[in-house]
């Protein structure tokens, strides 16, 4: 099968944008609409902007880009509806990808990945290609590549999370993924679905006790200002599923696809490096900004038994054969 890198490059042919540039790729300019819910600096916005800029450079006057961010056109769920109907051409999708294709539930299996090299090996290989094929069939979307939201950590105001027992009764904000909610219920927490923009105030007012996200989001949204504990769990790795409307993709010329292909690969690499840099730098930024926040490691062995049970339940949702193949690829 094609590697995800090749898939990403091929798919980028569908992602042109509406800002005039220099360097023609085709006689007729390609018009594209790009949008993201998040604000500048967030991982999904960073990836979409990197794609926009790379495509401009590649296509010049051959592309016109209409670009929106900061939720101008709605939240991620609305964006998914718009890209499927053709109102948008290219968007990044975070945890909500599972709402379009149950195979994406595998990403909610705890401790599936241990490092970024392992992630790249799986997503840039046959399993990434399988997810692309499934997304085309089930959602009408072409995956151009997989970027990074990152490894998620737990923050809260109740106690340090060291073992699953420490999660008991903790009101934890999660994304809308049913499998993420199920996972934390099985771990003993009380997960609450909530829009990310509401989290700070909800923590401040005690509506929720905490949340789980990579350092990039913790720092960007300043949640450390209203949290006492950050537990370095790295319990789940969340990719960015970078997609284009399939009909739009299929309408591209070979030259346009090649340009999109190159720009998407640039965006994938930029996104992954951005995530790695955030992990390397932002813990220290948070420590200096919020010296009263307590950091701790978890006892990962104590989570493993429950993680196996969660994996078995998620396998029923994602498909047992597919889940087995994915787990095998992740443990090579």
Question: Which residues fall in each region the model found?
Answer:
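Bacterial N-terminal signal peptides that target proteins for export
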Residues: 1-11
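Bacterial N-terminal signal peptides
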Residues: 10-20
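N-terminal secretory/targeting leader peptides
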Residues: 10-12, 28-118, 127, 136-332
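Short, solvent-exposed secondary-structure boundary motifs
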Residues: 17, 131-136
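Sec/Tat signal peptide C-region and signal peptidase I cleavage site
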Residues: 21-27
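Signature of the catalytic double-stranded beta-helix
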Residues: 122-132
């Amino acid at each position: 099968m094609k590697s995800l890198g090749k898939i990403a490059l091929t798919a980028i042919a569908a992602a042109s944008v509406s800002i005039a540039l220099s360097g023609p790729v085709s006689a007729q300019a390609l018009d594209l609409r790009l949008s993201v819910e998040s604000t500048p600096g967030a991982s999904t916005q960073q990836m979409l902007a990197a794609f926009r800029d790379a495509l401009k450079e590649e296509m010049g006057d051959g592309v016109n880009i209409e670009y929106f961010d900061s939720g101008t056109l709605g939240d991620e769920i609305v964006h998914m509806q718009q890209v499927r109907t053709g109102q948008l051409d290219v968007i990044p999708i975070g945890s909500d990808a599972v709402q379009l294709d149950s195979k994406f539930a595998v990403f909610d299996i705890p401790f599936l990945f241990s490092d970024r090299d392992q992630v790249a090996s799986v997503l840039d290989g046959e399993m990434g290609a399988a997810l692309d094929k499934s997304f085309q069939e089930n959602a009408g979307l072409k995956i151009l590549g997989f970027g990074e939201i990152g490894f998620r950590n737990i923050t809260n105001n109740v106690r340090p999370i060291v073992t699953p027992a420490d999660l008991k009764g903790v009101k934890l904000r999660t994304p809308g993924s049913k499998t993420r909610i199920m996972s934390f219920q099985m771990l003993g927490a009380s997960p609450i679905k909530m829009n990310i923009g509401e989290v700070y105030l909800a923590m401040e007012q005690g509506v929720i006790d905490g949340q789980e996200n990579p350092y990039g989001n913790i720092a960007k949204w300043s949640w450390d200002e209203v949290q006492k504990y950050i537990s370095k769990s790295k319990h789940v790795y969340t990719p960015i599923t970078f997609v284009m409307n399939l009909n739009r993709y299929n309408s591209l010329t070979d030259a346009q696809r090649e340009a999109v292909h190159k720009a998407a690969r640039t965006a994938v690499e930029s996104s992954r490096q951005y995530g790695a840099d955030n992990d390397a730098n932002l813990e220290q930024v948070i420590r200096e900004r919020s010296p009263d926040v307590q950091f701790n490691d978890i006892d990962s062995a104590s989570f493993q038994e429950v993680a196996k049970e969660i994996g078995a339940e998620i396998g029923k949702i994602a498909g047992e054969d597919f889940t087995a193949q994915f787990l095998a690829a992740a443990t090579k």
